[in-house]
Structures are given as C-alpha cells and as structure tokens.
C-alpha cells in the first residue's frame, strides 16, 4: 500500500498530526493525497495518564480514554485517513520514491513519514539507529532518547514529533508538535505557501 504521508504512532502527537492532516485533505492542493497512521498504542505514555492541566480537556480526564476517543474522532471527521491497527513498525528504510515501512505484518511505501513514537528505550527500528541520541529535555536517569532533527525534520521526507523529537513529556507540547509537523507537510504540498487549517463558527 502506498501513501503520500504515513504517521507512525498513535499517541498525542501522532493523533494530533493525523487530525490536522485529515482536516487539510479537502484543500485543492491535497486532492488525491493519501494519508495514514499506524496506531500501536500499547506503549503510549497516555495509558496511565490523568489530566487536570490541559486547556479544552475536562479535569480528571484519563489518557486511556483519549486514545480511544481520538481514533473515533479521526474516523468520524476524516475517514480518508487510513487507520492501521495492531501492527508494530520494524523498519523505516530509504526507497527510491520515499520510504519503505515494514511492520510485523505488512510492508508500506510513503513519500513522507512522521515518527511519532514515545521516547523510551529500547528503540529498535531498523533504518533509524543513526539518528538516535540521548533526550535533551528529560531526566538523564531515565535514559530517554530522541531523534536528531531540525524543527522536526530529520531529513527530506522524514519528520518526527512529540517526545521522540526532543519535546518534554507534556500533553499540550506533544499535541502542538504534531500539529506543527502536519502544517509543515501541508505547506510543502501547497508549493511552500504557509498553510494552516481553521474551522469557523457558523454565523446565523
């Protein structure tokens, strides 16, 4: 299966990236673009999280509920974004048209890839080993890792977002990181014209 963009990871940053990309697929410059997300949430930091300090979330919100609700929201609003579940990414390797993504079940090809996995060890995805460094904004005792990047870009067509991009483990920061990458990709598709996607309240 071939994609124009494939997101790897279904946590905060990955799902937020998918939602913003999905909202942009109806734009003229994104017509016929194919987007997908490989959702492997079992290792997500959200599983045991409780939120009281996130704008827009009611106090006492469980991270495990957000994981479920995020998938439902993406499917309901932007069904064009393919959700691939119960697959674990094994390799991300250069391909003549972008990247080949290998999971424990399938092989995919994408022009652009977004790494949105968590920052815990071990990180054993083949093809990304040379980009792994100690996390710059985490407690060294925990031995967290990140991928070398400049403003989320690792190299042409390869992005990262959230904690794996070097962000602190904070919900709002991770979400913003994912949204930032999505708008960078939409901008790229829009011939470099800076792009964002806003919905507006209807006026009666």
Regions found by a protein language model. Give the residues of each.
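Extreme N-terminal leader/targeting segments of oxidoreductases
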Residues: 1-4, 66-68, 73, 135-139, ...
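FAD-binding beta-loop-beta segment adjacent to the flavin cofactor pocket
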Residues: 130, 136-159, 166
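A conserved FAD-binding loop/helix module that cradles the flavin
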Residues: 25, 161-202
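Beta1-alpha1 glycine-rich phosphate/pyrophosphate-binding loop at the start
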Residues: 3, 7, 12-68
């Amino acid at each position: 299966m071939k994609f124009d963009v494939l997101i790897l990871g279904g946590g905060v940053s990955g799902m937020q990236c998918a939602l913003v990309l999905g909202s942009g697929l109806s734009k003229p410059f994104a017509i016929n673009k194919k987007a997908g997300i490989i959702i492997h949430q079992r290792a997500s930091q959200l599983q045991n999280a409780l939120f009281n300090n996130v704008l827009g979330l009611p106090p006492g919100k469980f991270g495990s509920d957000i994981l479920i609700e995020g998938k439902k929201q993406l499917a309901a609003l932007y069904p064009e974004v393919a959700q691939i579940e119960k697959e674990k990414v094994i390799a991300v390797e250069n391909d003549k048209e972008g990247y080949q993504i290998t999971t424990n079940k399938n092989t995919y090809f994408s022009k652009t890839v977004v790494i949105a996995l968590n920052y815990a060890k071990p990180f054993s995805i083949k093809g990304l080993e040379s980009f792994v460094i100690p996390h710059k904004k985490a407690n060294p005792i925990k031995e967290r890792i990140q991928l070398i990047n400049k403003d989320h870009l690792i190299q042409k067509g390869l992005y990262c977002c959230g904690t794996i991009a070097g962000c602190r483990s904070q919900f709002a920061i991770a979400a913003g990181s994912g949204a930032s990458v999505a708008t960078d990709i939409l901008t790229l598709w829009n011939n470099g014209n800076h792009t964002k996607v806003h919905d507006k309240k209807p006026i009666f």
